Amino acid sequence: MFTPTIYFPEIDSKTQTMPLEDSKLHHLRKVLRMKDFDNVNISNGQGQLFIGKFVNDSVQINTQKNFQRKNKICIFIPYLREKNRFRFMIEKLTELNVNRIFIGKTENTQNTKVDTLKIHNWALSALEQSGTPFFPKIEIVETIDYTIFDTCFDITGRVLKNDSPKVNTFAIGPEGGWTPEELSNFKFKYKLSDFSLRTDTAAISAVSLMM
């Protein structure tokens, strides 16, 4: 049975009862049709899930579960102008428990107005839908920092094999691909396919392979 999860980063092990704000109450009662004493989880986004019951417009905490990240993947992705695909990518990276998501421009990135609040809400929605105890650190940057990202995925790179070393920090290129100058800044280049992949497909595939 589906148990809804609420993201509340301020919760800690001392919390016994957590009142819910109106927007959460409306979603639980009107959308999910929850009743008193139904199960509810609360995630602090840092690896802790608080298990409780929905009672009198609050969550009464019964127990707590602690989780450790199996990996600490850090990924750079460019902006996508197609909002549906951009949202899909952010949601899936959140569900896959990516630790840090850098979002920035590349030479071939189309000019796009970035709504940081909207991106945060996409990730929040994915956390609450999937029930993960982890929330990614999302950083909006002007350009890629090659001192952090020395590995990229590109169709000109080496074939990624089963015995290839796992990397947890890597960059995904834009729809138009990396420029030769950008590629020269990476120490390591791998490819996911012999054919060009869309940015969202490449990001999700790369994370899945490196988990």
For each of these PLM feature ranges, what is it?
Residues 1-66:
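N-terminal positively charged helical leader segments and presequences
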Residues 19, 70-74, 167-168, 184-192:
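Glycine/charged-rich beta-loop-alpha catalytic/anionic-binding loops adjacent to active sites
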Residues 165-180:
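A C-terminal functional module that forms or caps the active site or interfaces directly
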